[in-house]
Amino acid sequence: MPSKNSINRPKQKLNLQHRVQKNAAKRSARERAGLLAPPRSSDQSQSGRAKSIPLDLFRGERVDQGPITTKTLSKKRAKKIERNLRYVEQRKLLVDVQAARESGMDIDVETAVSTKAKTQQTGPLQKVKESIWSALEDVAAQEMIVQTGAGTTLGGQFFP
């Protein structure tokens, strides 16, 4: 039979039939595997989730429905899964601790109000001192411009 791109190629009907047969075979295989039983939108759907036979065996879920199985879990793999699950738990705890720290960093509104009240209670001398110190801090925060050479990297003269 000539190839799909040859000059005397077969009719489109043959190609479409072949594609339909392939898709039907894939669909029936997915249905036999139980991937089409719940709709993709439901919570019980396994569609799009990672499938791990060793993890299913470790958790005690049945992978095969028959009495004889070829799926076993080695001791080394079981230890590895156990270690990885501990790491996941530690990571979750770390995320919780970091979230608690983030929420603890919020500024209390009452303390901000009390500091404003203290500054209002002080006299004019204290206000002058604070304004002078704030001006000094502003000057110290500005950039210090350092004079460099006269146009060369070594600082020598530059003749264009």
UniProtKB/Swiss-Prot annotation:
One of its GO terms (cellular component) is nucleus. This is Ribosome biogenesis protein ALB1. It is found in: Cytoplasm; Nucleus. It holds the Pfam family Alb1. Component of the nucleoplasmic and cytoplasmic pre-60S ribosomal particles. One of its GO terms (biological process) is ribosomal large subunit biogenesis. Belongs to the ALB1 family. Residues 1-58 are annotated as: Disordered. Keywords: Cytoplasm, Nucleus, Ribosome biogenesis, Transport. InterPro entries: Ribosome_bgen_Alb1. It comes from Eremothecium gossypii (strain ATCC 10895 / CBS 109.51 / FGSC 9923 / NRRL Y-1056). The keyword rRNA processing does not apply. Involved in proper assembly of pre-ribosomal particles during the biogenesis of the 60S ribosomal subunit. Accompanies the pre-60S particles to the cytoplasm. Its main location: cytoplasm.
